[in-house]
Amino acid sequence: MTTTGNLAVVAFDAADIEKLAAFYAELAGWEISDKDPDWITVRTGDGQEIAFQLAMNYLAPQWPGQEHPQQFHLDLYVDGYQAAAERAVGLGAKRLADGQTWVTLADPAGHPFDLVQKDGVGPGMELFAVTIDAPDASALARFYADLMGMEVTYEGPEGALIAGDGKSVMFQQVSEYNPPRWPDPAYPQQAHLDISVDDLDAGEARALELGASRLEGGGDTFRVFADPAGHPFCLTA
């Protein structure tokens, strides 16, 4: 497998990134590791990074419909998911749905996330996976696995999972999938992946070969693409 890049960070859009970063830091027991006016990074207990990007014209997802659908969500492991869900609501989340061993909530910016029971996790929460919606979960999993040098570790009717270097990305099969159409403000991105590469030209060639499309924007240290499902992502150097 040819490795082009490494998953650096997943970034969620929001109109109030200080509020959103503080929410996840307090809820999950994570650390705010970097703070700029338009970008705040939170580091998990095992060193993974989640960022919050300022988007003044942010349009929140309206789960579970597909008119303005969720695009990404976080799956968080916690020991005592019901108590954690109550605490999340107290911090500004909204309870959306209950499963057998998980609760789906919306964070203060409207992004859905799942709290999933896992015995022995703590004291902070554990990031199990970033989950990305797709019309063909297996195909999108293979795209990112090849792009980031990860392995497809699960494929099933509900989705697919890739893993590598201590990180996991899940792809959720969605019927009547409605993609983002960045930079169209009527169909904006809600989140994106930053993938680090040693060489932007070589990284771009590999991404295009695998089925990505080049989008507007970029600079000396990053370029913007859409994956085969329409989700924007950045290659960074």
Where does each model-flagged region fall?
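Solvent-exposed, charged amphipathic helical/linker segments at domain boundaries
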Residues: 117-132
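Residue-level recognition of short loop/turn positions
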Residues: 46, 107-109, 227-229
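Short hydrophobic/aromatic beta-strand micro-patches
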Residues: 11-13, 75-77, 131-133, 194-196
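Eukaryotic phosphotyrosine signaling hubs
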Residues: 7, 70-72, 189-191
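Short, structured interface segments
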Residues: 99-121
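Short beta->alpha transition motifs characteristic of CBS
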Residues: 115-121, 173-175, 235-237
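Core segments of cupin and vicinal oxygen chelate
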Residues: 2-56, 83-84, 90-98, 103-104, ...
